[in-house]
Amino acid sequence: MLDQKNAQLRLLGHDDLEMVLQWRNHDDIRKCMVISDIITLSDHFAWFERNKNRTDRLFYIFEYQQQPQGYISFVMIPNSTAYEWGFYIKPDAEKGMGQLLGNIALNHAFNKLGLEKVFGQVLSFN
């Protein structure tokens, strides 16, 4: 059983971009995304450069036993105090990792960041 004590979030860094892009472009992940196009490395780097210093967008790597397991974003909804979140786990993650990621991420959002509302989109087939 996965233990929350071994899980943590850290900010997404430039060194994580290739790994996260590989996860994001994997067929099992991409098919469950709102925008399912394959993303190029140059587009991914450009996205990071445009967004890395924005205070209304937060990007994290979820780690379990100090190993990267997933990606999480919190993006402020315009004209609101609410945020939308998105996440995915690496394609070969251990069973239960997604639930643990969700628990850790929402705890971080509400108890550390002080967010009051977090929304997400769910596709019917996911």
Which residues make up each language-model segment?
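A short, well-structured alpha-helix characteristic of acyl/acetyltransferase catalytic modules
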Residues: 1-38
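Conserved acetyl-CoA-binding loop-helix of GNAT-fold acetyltransferases
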Residues: 95-109
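Alpha-helical elements of Rossmann-like donor-binding domains used by nucleotide-donor carbohydrate transfer enzymes
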Residues: 19, 43-46, 100, 104
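Acetyl-CoA-dependent GNAT
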Residues: 37-93
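Short acidic/polar active-site loop segments enriched in Thr and Asp
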Residues: 116
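Conserved beta-strand-loop-alpha-helix junction that forms the acyl-donor binding cleft
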Residues: 119-126
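C-terminal active-site-capping segments
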Residues: 112
